[in-house]
C-alpha cells in the first residue's frame, strides 16, 4: 500500500533488508547491544516516510471509514500513512515507527509529525525503544485478537499490496472466506495466495480503489 506513495519497502524487490542486515537494526539483541545505533536507523525510516504523502488509495479508505463506521483497517505497515490520511482506527499488527516506549515504566510516546525523535530516553534514564514488532518478537496478543475478530466478521475483505506469506496475516483471507466474505486482492504482482481470492486486480491500489468505491463516496 505505502510503496505507491514512495515509502521504501522492507521485504520487496530492492527492499531495505536487501541493503541492511536486520540482525543489526531490528531485533531486541541489537537494541540492547547498541540502542543509539538502532534508534538512528529507525529515525531515518521516519524521515524518509515524511518525505512521502498518502496517495488517493489511503484517502479513499479514510473516506470509507468515515462514511461507513464498520470499515476496519488492519495493516502490517509501520509508517503511519493511514493515520496521516485521516484514518482514526487502525489495527497495526507490527506496531508503528511513530511510537516509542519505555519498557521499564510501560510508557508510550507518539508523534506523527516529526522525523527526528523528540526524546531518545525516558525520564527514568532508559533508552526509548521503537514500538515495533521486530524480528524474534512476539506479536501483541490483543492486537491479533482484535484483527482476527473484525476479519472473521467482515462481508468484504480486501488485501492490498501484501505477499500474504507472513503469519498471522497469511491466514486472514481464509478466515474472512470462512465467515462468508467476498475476497479481493489488489497487488501488481501475483502472490502465493492469489488463487484463493474471488477477484484479483493487478493495478495500483489507488486506481483500483477509485474504480470500486468512488460511486459510494
Q: What spans do the regions from the language model cover?
A:
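Conserved catalytic core of sirtuin-type NAD+-dependent deacylases
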Residues: 1-217
Amino acid at each position: 500500500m505505502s510503496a505507491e506513495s514512495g515509502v521504501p519497502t522492507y521485504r520487496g524487490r530492492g527492499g531495505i533488508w536487501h541493503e541492511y542486515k536486520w540482525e543489526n537494526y531490528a531485533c531486541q539483541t541489537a537494541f540492547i547491544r547498541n540502542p543509539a545505533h538502532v534508534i538512528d536507523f529507525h529515525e531515518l525510516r521516519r524521515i524518509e516516510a515524511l518525505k512521502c504523502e498518502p496517495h488517493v488509495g489511503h484517502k479513499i479508505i479514510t473516506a470509507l471509514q468515515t462514511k461507513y463506521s464498520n470499515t476496519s483497517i488492519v495493516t502490517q505497515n509501520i509508517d503511519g500513512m493511514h493515520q496521516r490520511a485521516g484514518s482514526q482506527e487502525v489495527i497495526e499488527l507490527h506496531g508503528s515507527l511513530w511510537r516509542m516506549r519505555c519498557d521499564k515504566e510501560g510508557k508510550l510516546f507518539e508523534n506523527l509529525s516529526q522525523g527526528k525523535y523528540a526524546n531518545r530516553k525516558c525520564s527514568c534514564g532508559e533508552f526509548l525503544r521503537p514500538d515495533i514488532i521486530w524480528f524474534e518478537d512476539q506479536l501483541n496478543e490483543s492486537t491479533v485478537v482484535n484483527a482476527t475478530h473484525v476479519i472473521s466478521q467482515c462481508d468484504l475483505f480486501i488485501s492490498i499490496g501484501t505477499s500474504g506469506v507472513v503469519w498471522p496475516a497469511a491466514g486472514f483471507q481464509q478466515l474472512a472466506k470462512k465467515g462468508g466474505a467476498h475476497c479481493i486482492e489488489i497487488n501488481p504482482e501475483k502472490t502465493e495466495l492469489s488463487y484463493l481470492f474471488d477477484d484479483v486486480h493487478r493495478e495500483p491500489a489507488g486506481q483500483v480503489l477509485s474504480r470500486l468505491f468512488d460511486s459510494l463516496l
